[in-house]
Amino acid sequence: MLFRSDWQDLAAEYTKETGVPVTVVTAASGQYETTLMSEMEKSEAPTLFQVNGPVGLANWKDYCYDLSGSQLYGELTSDSFALKDGDAVAAIAYVIETYGIIYNKELLTAAGYTQDDIKGFDDLKKVADDIQARKAELGVDGAFTSAGMDGSSDWRFKTHLANLPIYYEYKADGIGSTDAIKGTYLDNYKQIWDLYITDSTCDPKLLASKTGNDAVAEFTGKKAVFYQNGTWAYGDVSSLGDDNLGMLPIYIGVEGEENQGLCTGSENFWCVNNAASEADIQATLDFLYWCVTSDKGTSAMADDMGFVIPFKAAKDSTNPLIGIANQYVADGKTSVDWCFSTMPSEEWKNGVGSALTAYAAGTGDWDGVVTAFVDGWAKEYKLANG
């Protein structure tokens, strides 16, 4: 977990205040589910664990204590931040994050544009194409940072970018999940991916080995104007200066997208183990309540972890990207939901990622992406749900 030491510090602070010991167990990157399975089999299983959304909850709902009567649930600012299993509140989101296209204001201005010039995909393409054509004159290597497809970066495209066509399909069909994605908006997915890999700092054939750190270095080194990432990346890009950072929605060319905002949601939901003793369940609920209501807890989550938490006592974050995200909402823009928690499996994401990489390298075609997206979804959903 990214914030392991922060959570351990917070747990130690709680123990100091209350005398109640709190042990924090963390997992290696990408190993949370495996670690949780082995921990839950122990005689002293964790009393608190997390799921990433509806798909994660499906695996663990039988272990989830109903939080509907808890003080913690009463502190939520909106019921939409709770995951339900029937009438029971099985899980509660504890951090809300936002992503889009972060941009360097200074470089965009030097190219002769402002955010007001970009209200949809056609505008974004026009501006990016122009920057790419004038890259030598502007002193950049490309409009967009490299869309690295190694394990440190591919989630930005096989998951976060893939969220857009899923969101619009769900919206058009009036659904919140599906056993068979139709791929209605995959042409839109193609055109934004084409833009990312064409108006880029590097040859698309090199993307398989490009990393998340490469993209950060290009962006902070002022070699690219646009960088797809989220509020959590502020620490990586803060050297450019707060006033120099802007954020655009990820436009994919859908009707009405001038009213689209940034992508906002959560992949982090707290669950309390219903197999724990009543005393341990209450102790866990007391700790969580303290985290989201006490000055020490809310300060640690806002300042040390940089979180926006969906609870009434939340402190304002000093992260300027969060301020930008809040402004989109205040301006009446419609936030794009995080639908990727309904993606059928990690294997599905990997299949889409491999197909995107092959397409960029010229060793595969777009049909391969469509197959991985649509057929892969039906197959993985069936494997997961029988």
Regions found by a protein language model. Give the residues of each.
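Extracytoplasmic/periplasmic solute-binding protein
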Residues: 90-94, 99, 125-178, 224
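Extracytoplasmic/periplasmic substrate-recognition and gating elements
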Residues: 111, 239-304
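Glycine-centered hinge/linker elements that transmit conformational signals in sensory
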Residues: 128-129, 175-208
